Amino acid sequence: MPRRQILSSEEQERLLVIPDDEIILTRMCFLNEPDIALINKHRRPANRLGFAVLLCYLRGPGFIPDKSSAPHNGVVSRVASRLKLQPDLWPEYASREQTRWEHLTELYRYLYLELSPFSRSMQKDCIRHLHPYAMRTDKGFMLAEEMLSWLHNNNVIFPSVEVIERTLAEVVTLANRSVFSTLTAQLEKQHKSALDSLLISEGEQPSRLAWLLQPPGKINGKNVLQHIDRLNSIAALGLPDGIALSVHQNRLLKLAREGRKMSSRDLAKFTDVRRYATLVCIITEARATLTDEVIDLHERILGSLFSRAKRTQAERLQQTGKLIQSKLKQYVTVGQALLNARESGEDPWTAIEDVLPWQEFINSVEETRFLSRKGNFDALHLITEKYSTLRKYAPRMLSALQFMATPAAQALSDALDTITEMYRKQLRKVPPSAPTGFIPESWRKLVLTPSGIDRKYYEFCVLNELKGALRSGDIWVKGSRRYKNFDDYLIPTAEFEKSRHNDQLQLAVQTDSQAYLQARMTLLASRLEEVNAMALAGDLPDVDISDKGVKITPLENSVPSGVSPFADLVYGMLPHPKITEILEEVDSWTGFTRHFAHLKNNNVRPKDGRLLLTTILADGINLGLTKMAESCPGATRSSLEGIQTWYIRDETYSAALAELVNAQKERPLAAFWGDGTTSSSDGQNFRVGSHGRYAGQVNLKYGQEPGVQIYTHISDQYSPFYAKVISRVRDSTHVLDGLLYHESDLEITEHYTDTAGFTEHVFALMHLLGFAFAPRIRDLHDKRLFIHGKAERYPGLQSVISTTCLNIKDIESHWDEVLRLATSIKQGTVTASLMMKKLASYPKQNGLAKALREIGRIERTLFMLDWFRDPGLRRRVQAGLNKGEARNALARAVFLHRLGEIRDRGLENQSYRASGLTLLTAAITLWNTVYIERAIESLKRKGIPINEQLVSHLSPLGWEHINLSGDYVWRNNLKLGSGKYRSLRTVDTALYKKQS
C-alpha cells in the first residue's frame, strides 16, 4: 500500500523557498573572515562561488538548494559581489555533482559546532515535538512549517523534502491512532454495542444513524417533537459525559464531517477503534446541532404565532372598520342631540330617542363595547388563540433541554422550572408563588389578573422572554453550540491577561483606558472645533446646519459623458463565450480548482476536473445537480453527488474564491478601480420556493415573505471576496465577518455599508479592530452628535448635538471586558457575528453592551463630522456601494434557473448555492477584466487615444456578451493553449472617434 501523501506538489515547492526580503537576504549572505578564508582555499572561481552559496544556505535557512534547481538569484548575486566574482558561474558549479558532495562534507565538518545533521534520533525528537500539534490538525503544510521552525531553533540541517514528508506521515499516523484511542478509551462494551446498533437498517428503512442526522423539515411542533426524540435517543446511548472534550475541536469536527458524508455500510467497514471514534464524533456534533435546531424551531414557531396574531388583529380591524365608522357617526348624532337639548333645555332622554330608538341605543352601546376590546387593537391579546400549538411540544422541550442562567436571568430560570414542574404534575393553575419579576410591562395586565396568574399568557410570556435571554447569553443550554455561556466564547481570562502583559492583543487601540480616552477625547474636541468653525462660516461643502437640523445636498453625477460610448466600444470587442468556457479559461489562468481537495485527504483532487466545474456551475446558476446532469452530456447525478459530497465544502469554496480575488488584484486594469484597501457589503434577498420555504426566514428589510439572504463583501476592484447566508437578523451583524475571515490577500482598511449595516456596536468593534467604517446613513438628519461637555461650546452644531452626554465612566468600568471581547474576535476564538447577535440581545443595563455603545457613539460622532466636512468621503462611499449594487445585478442575472428561487431546505446546501454564485461572479469579473485589458491594448495599437479617466469608470460586471443558459457542454476543440486568448471581435472605431 503506497504511503499517504502529506504535502501536495505545490506545498513541497513552497516549503523550502527563500523570501524576496532584502533584510533576510542580506543577513543570510553575511560572511565573516574565517568563512572567507575557507572559501578562498578553493582555487576555481566557480567552486568558490558554489561553496559560499552552500555555506550561506546551511547557516541561514538550514537547507541546501535542490541540485535540480538554481538557488535564489538574490543569494547568488550578493555572494558573488562579496567575493568579487561573476554570478553566472553557478551553472558551471552545479554541473559537477562530485564536487558538490565533497564541498558539503567539508561544510558539515566546518559547521559541526553550529549545526547538527538530521539523524534518526533527531527525527524521533522531532516526532515527539510535533505530536501535540498533529493532535490538533492533520494539515500537512502547517505541520511542516512547525517542523522546520523546530529544526531551525535547534540548529539542525533540514533534510530533503522526501524525508520531511516521511516524518510528517509518521507523525500524522501516530496522532490519528492517539485520537482514536482517546475517543474510545472510556467506552464500555454496552456503549460499543449501542453505537453499532446505529448502523443497522431494517429493510428499506434508513439506519438509526441516518435518522438521527435528518434535517428538521417544516416549521411545526411535530418536527420539534421528532428532534426531541432524536436527542432522547442520543441520551439513551449513555455515552460518558465529556467523552469528546479530550480531543481538539478541529479533529472532532473533521472526523464528524467525514463520518456524516459516509453511508452506514461504509462506516461499518472501518476498524473497530476508528469506527467507534468516528461515531462518537458524529453523535457529539449531532447532539449540539439538534439542540440548536430545537431552539431555532421553537423561536420560529413563536415568531409565526406572533405574526399570525398581528395578521388576525389587522384583519378583524379591517372587517369591523365600516361598523366602527357607522358607530362613530351614530355617536356624533347622539352627541349633537344632547348638546342641542342642553342649549334648549329639553329632556336629554327624549332628545336621544328622537334620533335613535332607546333599544337600538342600548344595542349600539353593547356593540361598541365589543368593538372596543383590546383584542381588536392589540395583537398580544390574541396570542393565546394558538396555545395548543405551543402546548404540543413545550413540555417535552423544557424537559429535554438543560437551561442554566446568570444571576440577571435567575427569575426567568425559576419561571421555566415552575412551568416544567406544572407540566410534570399536570397542574392546571399557576402557583401564586410563581416568579413574576421578569414580566415586561406590556404583558403584565394580561398575565397578572384579579383572579390570579393567567396560565396561557404566563407560558407565552416565559417562552417569549426565554428567546431573548438565549440570544443574549443570560440563559444558556448545556450541549448547545450557539447558546453557550457568554464567557465560554471568549479567550480565558488568564490567557488574555498574559497577552495583554506581553503587548500581544493585536488590537488597533491603546490598552490603557486613560491613554485611549484622552487621545479620543482630544481628537473629538479638535474635530468638533474645526467643523463648528466651518459651520459658522458656511464653509461646509454642500452641507447646511441650521436650527432645523442638517441638510446635505445630494452628490452630482461625476461620471464623464464619454464613458458610455467608450464602454460600448470596449464591450463590443469582447468575445461571446459560454459560461462553461469562461470557467475553464479562468481555471487555466489561476488553477482555482486545485483548492477543491478531498475531505479525507487534502492532496487528492477530482480525477475529472470538468465534473468539478459542472458541480460548481450547478450551484452558481441555481440549476441543481439533477437538472445539471440532464443538461450536461457525460455527467450523471451520482457522479455530481460524489463530487459534491467529497470536494465541495465552505472552506474549499473560500480558498478557490481567494485565488480569483488575488488574481484580480494582480491585473493592471484593477489598479484603475482601486488599490484593494476599501470595500463595501450588502445583503441580497432571494425568494424561496418548494421545500425551501421551510428553511427561508422573514427579514423585514425585504418584506413579509420568507427568503434567503446572501450577504456579500466586494472590494474596490469589483471582486467579491466573501459571501455568507444570513438569517433574519440585521445586516450589521455580519459586516465584520467578511473583513476578518476572508482568505484573500486584500488588506482592507476602510469599509462601506448602507443604513442596515451600521449600529453603534459595529462602529465600536470596527474601530477596536482597526477598520475605518463609513456607512451611508439614510436618516442622518435624525442622528445626533455625542460630546463630552457642554453643547454651548459649539454654537454652529448645537442643533445636532444630543442632549445626552457621553458616559465615559461606562467605558472605564468595563474597559477590560471590551478588550477581551475584541481580542477574542481578532484571534478567531469566536466569530464577530455571533458576538454581535449576543450584544444586540443584551438588556440595556448590561455593562459591556453599554461600554461598547459609548465607544460606538464616539466613533459615529467622529464619522458624522468627517461626513459633514469631507465630500470626498461621501463620494467614496457612494462609489463603493454602487459597485456592490452592480455586482448584485450580475448575481441576479447569473442565478437564473428555478425562477431565481432557492429551493434547498438545508442551510448547508443553501450555503453551497451562495458560494457557487459568488465564485461564478468572481470568475466572470476576472474574465471580463482580462479581456477589457486586451481590448484597450488593441485600441491603443490602432491609434485610438485612451483617456485613463474613462478607463477608471469601466466596470467588469457586464454579462450581456455571456451565454448563461442552454446545454452546458465542455468542448475539447475550443480549449485554449497556455498563454493563448480568444480573438477580440471587430468593431467600427470610426464611429467612436466621431462621437468622442
Placement of each model-derived feature along the sequence:
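Glycine- and acidic
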Residues: 35-36, 568, 605-614, 621-627, ...
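Structured nucleic-acid-interacting core domains from mobile-element enzymes and related host factors
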Residues: 660-696
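Short, conserved catalytic/metal-binding motifs centered on acidic residues
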Residues: 62, 628, 679-685, 751-756
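Long amphipathic alpha-helical coiled-coil/heptad-repeat bundle
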Residues: 2-522
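Short, charged amphipathic recognition helices of the HTH superfamily
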Residues: 50-51, 69-73, 620-631, 637
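Long, compositionally biased intrinsically disordered regions
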Residues: 801-996
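Catalytic or ion-translocation cores adjacent to nucleophile or general acid/base/metal-coordination motifs
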Residues: 89, 630-671, 698-816
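Structured, charged N-terminal subsegments at the starts of enzyme catalytic cores
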Residues: 526-631
